[in-house]
Curated annotation (Swiss-Prot):
PANTHER family: ENDO-1,4-BETA-XYLANASE C, GLYCOSYL HYDROLASE. Transmembrane segments: none annotated. This is Probable endo-1,4-beta-xylanase C. It is found in: Secreted. GO terms for cellular component: extracellular region. Pathway: Glycan degradation; xylan degradation. The gene is xlnC. It comes from Aspergillus terreus (strain NIH 2624 / FGSC A1156).
Amino acid sequence: MVRLTVLAGFLLTSAACSACVIGERQAAASINNAFKAKGKKYFGTCGDQGTLSDSTNSAIVKADFGQLTPENSMKWDATEPNRGQFSFGGADYLVNYATSNGKMIRGHTLVWHSQLPGWVQGITDKNTLTSVLKNHITTVMQRYKGKIYAWDVVNEIFNEDGSLRKSVFYNVLGEDFVRIAFETARSVDPQAKLYINDYNLDNANYAKTKGMADHVRKWISQGIPIDGIGSQTHLGSGGSWTVKDALNTLASSGVSEVAITELDIAGASSTDYVNVVNACLSVSKCVGITVWGVSDKYSWRSNDKPLLFDSNFQPKAAYNAIISAL
């Protein structure tokens, strides 16, 4: 059992003003501290200026989580809406917030078929798309070089049957877009961990999980610098039991690390959340967990109530169960 204490500041403020809730931490112990005490790198969450400007949400992030992923501000439509015209307001906010509060950052995401500007989707020339791809990755990564622990270099490039998705990148460049993206990323920031990230990688026997592991194994053998596989882990209720074996399958591909990158679970049962945490703990290459939001209030799946804090920012039973399990 990890021994944890409540922040003294919370106790002092609560004693001084029992009616003051906004801005105070809502959980008795930091899930990040407990997880790191077990040898992992971080237990994090996602956010952007909107949610991080909410004082209650921000207080929980500062007190309980150790890593941040930008929810939308680093995606292509946000950073390069027009060719060669970059916009970093939202991403800068996230990076400045994280660095000033001592949070690790996972950059998300450099190459994705969704939230992709029309001008990129309309490219049909191989040389043009190669140039655009390299320039985008280089410009974004250079801006934050040395501040990002890991980058999701490519995101959601697989179909459910384990084949490669027919995105503009694949249609124009073929499978080689993966090599171009990772080699460019490595040249820009050699210290950053470079990830391939996807969803529905939660069952070792699922075609997509097998396809991911097989392709990554092949790409690594070809010298493509892939450091990690990110499993988003958006789960339905009861979907946690297969996560451990799936992580082991992904880890067997030859990557140096794996991570749970966008965790949320319909219903947020204590059993499901503890199962996922234990899965990461049991897989030596699993370096951390990121939940996809703090409170159900801001969740993209709000109707499923999938997060660790309810819409009033109170910790759920699952949060406390994780602390107890650790």
